[in-house]
C-alpha cells in the first residue's frame, strides 16, 4: 500500500472508449470522491462524455488503496469507485490497516463489490490491534516497544498480557525465567499452526467469524454511504460570507429586541 492512507480518497484517470476506438486518446485525472450528481457534469466539462461518446474506462490509478490489484482495472465502474472512495473517507483511524490485514489473510477478492462489502463490515473483521502494558514506552532512541518488537513478539505480549499466572512465574525470584522465555518463538508457533496472521500493528484471528463478501448489494452500500458522506460534507462545509452576515444581522436584531423588551419590563416593575 502506498504511503498515502487514502482517507482523503484517491485519484483515477478516466478515458472514453468511443474516442479511443476512433483513434483519439482522451483521458483526465479525477479525484474521488465527488458527489454522484456532479460526476456526469464533470465528465462533460472535461470532454470525456457527449451524446455519441458515453462509455468511459479507467486508464490508470494514482496508487491503490489496498493490495488487491485484481479488483482495480480498466473495467472498474466509476460510480463504484466513487462509493469506495467515500467509504474510505468515512473510516475511523486504524480501519485501513485492519482491512488490508483481512485482504492479506482472508478469502481472495475478485470483484470491487466484494472489497466494498469488506470495507462496509470493517468493524466485524476478526482483526485486532496489538495491546499490552508498556507498548508505548520509549527507549533511549525514542522507539516504542511496539515499534522495536517483531510482530511475533507483539502478538505474544498481547496474548500473555493478562495471564497473571504466566507473569507470576516469569517474575519469580530475580526474574531469570523471563530472560529465557522466547516471545518471538511463541508468535512463530501461533503462525505456523495456522492460528493467526501477523501484521505490523495488528493480527488476524484465522479461526474467527468472517463477514460475507456478498452480504450487501452495491445499491445498499451505495445508498447508505452516499447519505452518510453527504451528511459529513454538510457538517464540514464552512459557512458562506452571506450566511455569516445574515446570521450576524439576525443575532443583532434579536439582541436589540431583547434589550427593548428588557427596558420595558424594567419600567413596569
Features from the language model and the residues they span:
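Conserved NAD+-utilizing ADP-ribose enzyme module
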Residues: 128-130, 149, 153-154, 199, ...
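Short, surface-exposed beta-strand/loop "edge" segments at domain boundaries and coil↔beta transitions
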Residues: 19-24, 64-68, 210-213
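Glycine-rich, aromatic-bearing surface loops/beta-hairpins
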Residues: 161, 166, 170-234
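Non-Sec secretion/translocation targeting segments of pathogen effectors
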Residues: 182, 237-269
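N-terminal ordered "arm"
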Residues: 2-52
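Extracytoplasmic/secretory-pathway segments with low complexity and glycosylation-like composition
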Residues: 112-164
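Structured domain cores in non-transmembrane regions
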Residues: 37-117
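Ordered hydrophobic segments in well-structured contexts
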Residues: 9-15, 27-31, 55-60, 195-206
Amino acid at each position: 500500500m502506498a504511503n498515502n492512507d487514502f482517507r482523503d480518497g484517491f485519484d483515477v484517470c478516466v478515458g472514453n472508449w468511443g474516442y479511443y476506438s476512433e483513434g483519439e486518446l482522451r483521458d483526465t485525472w479525477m479525484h474521488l470522491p465527488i458527489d454522484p450528481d456532479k460526476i456526469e457534469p464533470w465528465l462533460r466539462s472535461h470532454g470525456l462524455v457527449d451524446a455519441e461518446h458515453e462509455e468511459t474506462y479507467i486508464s490508470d490509478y494514482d496508487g491503490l488503496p489496498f493490495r488487491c490489484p485484481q479488483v482495480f482495472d480498466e473495467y472498474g465502474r466509476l460510480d463504484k469507485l466513487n462509493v469506495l472512495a467515500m467509504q474510505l473517507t468515512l473510516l475511523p483511524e486504524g480501519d485501513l490497516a485492519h482491512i488490508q490485514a483481512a485482504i492479506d489473510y482472508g478469502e481472495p477478492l475478485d470483484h470491487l463489490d466484494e472489497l466494498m462489502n469488506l470495507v462496509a463490515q470493517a468493524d466485524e473483521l476478526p482483526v485486532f490491534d496489538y495491546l499490552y502494558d508498556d507498548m508505548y514506552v520509549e527507549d533511549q532512541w525514542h522507539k516504542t516497544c511496539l515499534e522495536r518488537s517483531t510482530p511475533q513478539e507483539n502478538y505474544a505480549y498481547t496474548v500473555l498480557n493478562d495471564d497473571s499466572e504466566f507473569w507470576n512465574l516469569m517474575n519469580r525470584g530475580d526474574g531469570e525465567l523471563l530472560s529465557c522465555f522466547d516471545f518471538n518463538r511463541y508468535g512463530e508457533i501461533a503462525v505456523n499452526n495456522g492460528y493467526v496472521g501477523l501484521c505490523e500493528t495488528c493480527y488476524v484471528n484465522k479461526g474467527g467469524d468472517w463477514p460475507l463478501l456478498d452480504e450487501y448489494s452495491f445499491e445498499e452500500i451505495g445508498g447508505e454511504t452516499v447519505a452518510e458522506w453527504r451528511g459529513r460534507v454538510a457538517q464540514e462545509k464552512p459557512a458562506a460570507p452571506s450566511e455569516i452576515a445574515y446570521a450576524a444581522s439576525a443575532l443583532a436584531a434579536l439582541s436589540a429586541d431583547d434589550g427593548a423588551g428588557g427596558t420595558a419590563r424594567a419600567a413596569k416593575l
